[in-house]
Regions:
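Cell-envelope/extracellular polymer assembly enzymes that use nucleotide-activated donors
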Residues: 6-8, 40, 199
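Donor nucleotide-sugar binding loop of glycosyltransferases
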Residues: 16-20, 48, 76, 102
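Short, well-formed alpha-helical segments that are part of the catalytic scaffolds
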Residues: 16-32
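Conserved donor nucleotide-binding strand/loop of the catalytic core
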Residues: 39-42, 53-86
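A conserved acidic beta->alpha catalytic loop
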Residues: 45-54, 99
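Acceptor/aglycone-binding surface of glycosyltransferases and processive sugar-polymer synthases
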Residues: 71-86, 91, 103-188, 194
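Catalytic donor-sugar/metal-binding loop of nucleotide-sugar-dependent glycosyltransferases
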Residues: 178-179, 198-208
């Protein structure tokens, strides 16, 4: 029976042809190949219509550790959930396709994970954080949203929406199977599922 990988990197995608031109997936694999632990990459697609899926399969053929998961267009929440639950890693990270947070930043998350934390999240609001190419109005909107979330649901978490979150195998199964806001994968026209991060962290806070 194959040994489960130490880390699963789950990358959701939707119409990513422009990002694929920037070799983002090659950069992910290049980093992982330098590590001394076993790994896999789950490319979980949200019903792309621009040729992304074909490119993902072509990329996966080059590496036995890379797998492609095709989903209906239901939005980021269900797409990430499908990938996280399909992953086999002892630890599972989901990260944005454009690698706005480079995968090497996981080294900062390991510091917390090694202190017996089962959920560790990235934050763009920490001292020294750099928001690459983010418009000022998006930053302001994000700050307003996070203030509202802190007030109503999850006090103490400065950035719920950063797409860089690490979960143990146990936490993954416990939390992602409890998601209700977008618990069922249904095809959507707008496919807006931004609230899934908030629900996920709310559940994690209850677990702590």
């Amino acid at each position: 029976m194959p040994t489960k990988p130490y880390l699963s990197v789950v990358i959701p995608s939707y119409n990513e042809m422009e990002n694929l031109k920037n070799n983002v997936l090659e950069k992910v694999v290049t980093y992982l190949k330098k590590q001394d632990y076993t790994w896999e990459v789950i490319l979980t697609d949200d019903g792309s219509q621009d040729g992304t899926v074909k490119k993902l399969h072509q990329f996966a053929k080059k590496y036995s550790q890379v797998k492609v998961l095709e989903n209906i267009h239901a939005g980021k929440g269900p797409t990430v959930k499908a990938g996280m639950l399909a992953a086999q890693g002892q630890w599972r990270l989901f990260t944005d396709f454009d690698q706005s947070t480079p995968l090497a930043e996981i080294e900062k998350l390991w510091l917390r994970a090694n202190q017996n934390h089962e959920v560790v999240i990235g934050s763009r609001e920490m001292v020294g954080s750099v928001r690459d190419k983010e418009p000022w109005y998006r930053h302001l909107m994000g700050r307003g949203f996070n203030i509202l979330v802190q007030t109503l649901a999850i006090p103490g978490i400065l950035d719920t929406q950063c797409g860089f979150k690490l979960f143990s195998d146990h936490a993954t199964k416990l939390l992602f199977n409890q998601l209700h806001v977008y618990g069922q994968q249904e095809q959507r026209g707008d496919a807006f599922t931004g609230a899934f991060d908030v629900e996920l962290l709310f559940l994690a806070k209850k677990m702590a």
